[in-house]
A protein has these predicted regions:
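Membrane-interface extramembranous regions
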Residues: 1-144
Length: 144
């Protein structure tokens, strides 16, 4: 998988996840024991990930940027690096009290922590570690 392919695939996946957050049939109310859970009343996408309008828009926007960035190798690598940084910051916010909900605007706790951590690692790999060398130039014909 190249950085371009990764940026395109993850971009499409993030756009689909962002759009899925607006489909009522895919949203489940958060569990909790008689409202004692901190999640009580917060919707969850597929029952796992926080889903608010801002949360959905942020992930869809990152996905659209990935799709656009995948048009060139430079754009894909740049997107992977920037998206990786964004996912790292979102992961860190998820473990800090008061930032784990972005002041009540966007849930970043629970399963969102490991999701953002995984996305950070994948983006970092394709942005900094996985080098896509250009295709080899055709060899000149040798004369014998």
């Amino acid at each position: 998988v190249t950085s371009r392919g990764f940026a395109l695939a993850l971009g499409v996946l993030l756009v689909l996840m962002g759009l899925a957050g607006f489909v009522p049939q895919l949203i489940r109310p958060a569990g909790g024991v008689h409202g004692l859970s901190l999640d009580a009343g917060r919707p969850l996408l597929f029952g796992w990930f926080g889903a608010t309008a801002l949360h959905n828009v942020v992930y869809a926007a990152i996905g659209v940027a990935g799709i656009v960035g995948s048009r060139s190798l430079t754009g894909a690598v740049s997107w992977c690096r920037r998206a990786g940084l964004a996912f790292f910051v979102l992961m860190l916010c998820g473990v800090v009290p008061h930032l784990d909900t972005m002041f009540g605007l966007m849930p970043l706790y629970g399963n969102d922590i490991w999701l953002n951590g995984l996305l950070w690692l994948l983006c970092a790999y394709f942005g900094w570690l996985h080098h896509n060398p250009p295709p080899p130039a055709p060899e000149a014909e040798r004369e014998i």
